[in-house]
Amino acid sequence: KNAVLTIIKNSDIELLSFDNQGTSFKYKNYTINLPLRGKHQILNCVLAINLAEIIINDIDQDKVNKAIINTSWSGRIEKLTKNDIYFDVAHNYDGIKAMINTVKSNHPQKKLFGLFCIKGDKNMNSISDLIRESFHQIIICQDKNKYLLSVNKLSKILDKKSINHLSVSSVKEGVNIIKNINVKEYVGLIFGSHYIAKEVYNEFGKDFDTTYN
């Protein structure tokens, strides 16, 4: 009750550049260099700026810019190697669509090669349509702890949608395939859940933050 309503308009944001390194844009009196990939992250950033301005009187714009430019967010179109292999925890239709749109914008000449797993409570009907429309190759797997849909159940869902796919027994096996794709032709995308983060990072020699979940 009596809360202040702030409306963020796309017309208030001036996009300066958008590439595989991040996004630069102008908003209000700010010129922002955001190191996160994806135009959807611009709205997240602008929302954070507005919240900070409400909470902090006379906020220092230089400090805001410095904080943003040092931002990192694991599992959000995160580049895992110098080749084009990414990890994204997108696990619903909107998140997966944003991921696909971002990667296609950055790599318009390449096909998508995916390693996918997901929880059983998601809307697989719409997600399956996205996968069929967007991916040239898709591999499915399950996490070690069995939190996610079994490969057998996920395979049946994709079969009903006439989606060609390869089933593998583990994240490790799927990652090994992704690592060996033709990077001149494909972009590798590992996506669908944060539950596989530790397994994915282990395969790429990256440290796993135990606060991640």
Language model regions located:
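Short glycine-/acidic-enriched loop or helix-start segments at secondary-structure transitions
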Residues: I96-K97, M124-S126, S150-V151, E199-N202
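Short hydrophobic/aromatic-enriched beta-strand-loop microsegments
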Residues: A3-I7, K111-L112, Q137-I140, F208-N213
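Nucleotide phosphate-binding/pyrophosphate-handling subdomain across enzymes
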Residues: K28-Q137
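Extended acidic/charged loop-beta regions that coordinate divalent cations
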Residues: K1-Y30
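Glycine/aspartate-rich loop-and-adjacent alpha/beta segment that forms the canonical ThDP
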Residues: H194-N213
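Short SAM/SAH-binding signature in class I
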Residues: L47, I181-I196
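Short, acidic/turn-prone active-site loops that include or flank metal/cofactor-
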Residues: N10-D12, F116-K119, C141-Y147
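C-terminal helical cap/extension that packs against the catalytic core
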Residues: K1-N2, N20-G22, D84-I85, S128-V187
